[in-house]
């Protein structure tokens, strides 16, 4: 029997779905007006934070399309959405906070995003210890030390962001996917949905801390269609009744839509709480859904089946054998290898998108049609 909670949810989602089928009103384009960019998130925008922090590099199969060797620690075959956005505003790729050796400087910003991170605080079972709260704390430490160093030697402004760069910089966020996806392993659908407001309360606390540090320009990505990831389909889609007509797991996408609906509601309220601030909400869900549902129209052959995997169609994915790895599965030694042409695939390794898909998403973001801005700036 459908619960009252589910009934109310379906009504809310109807509004959310109708909202996400078309570009958002009040469009806003990212620009090079911002002197620096500070990014927070998970593997969608991790440019090497987790690998630097835990002391490892992804398999050589990663980053073969663009960065090649030595790999930077991105969980992709090439560039991420954030990389394309930095290119568009003529800024260098963001250097990870924990990266101790690099030819890059931090003058134009810093990346605190770490793969597998959540908005919620990490626990003993978490793969990444760098939850959103930790990332915010890292930023606060980073800013404090940078300004101390510049005060001692002004020449360091050639390599480090000044106070002006911090106060006028753009603060970007792409996080929450792992909170939702991870919850399904131990919780019912109703429990996952009930968790969303708690997750967003924690997110808002991070915004509050950053505002206290002088952040005023916020750029927030909502989460994508989680139910269309091959990993999710492989584990939660064995019962075909749980799949929609596109082969995606309905419950996961339903949770993603509710998360986005409530995140958008929070986005509307934040400028009222924080004077002289500007918040931009970017509808990643609509862009990625369009790509997956209409992949052939955009030159892709496969929307869910992964490029770097094993097992062949329909998913070419084995959760016991990650991209580039060799392992024994069902008594057989197998290797998950990259496909011949990654540009024909939306999904890279079952969890992450290919560079070609990331380029598609970034180009749609840059049109400004999928972003909405709410401001309390005294103009």
Swiss-Prot record:
GO terms for cellular component: apoplast. InterPro entries: GDSL, SGNH_hydro_sf, SGNH_plant_lipase-like. CDD domains: SGNH_plant_lipase_like. One of its GO terms (molecular function) is hydrolase activity, acting on ester bonds. Its main location: secreted. It is an enzyme of class 3 (hydrolase). It is found in: Secreted. It comes from the Eukaryota. The active site is at 43 (nucleophile), 349, 352. Gene3D superfamilies: SGNH hydrolase. Residues 1-27 form the signal peptide. Keywords: Glycoprotein, Hydrolase, Lipid degradation, Lipid metabolism, Secreted, Signal. Its EC number is 3.1.1.-. Glycans are attached at residues 294, 330. One of its GO terms (biological process) is systemic acquired resistance. The keyword Secreted applies. Belongs to the 'GDSL' lipolytic enzyme family. This is GDSL esterase/lipase At3g05180. It comes from Arabidopsis thaliana (Mouse-ear cress).
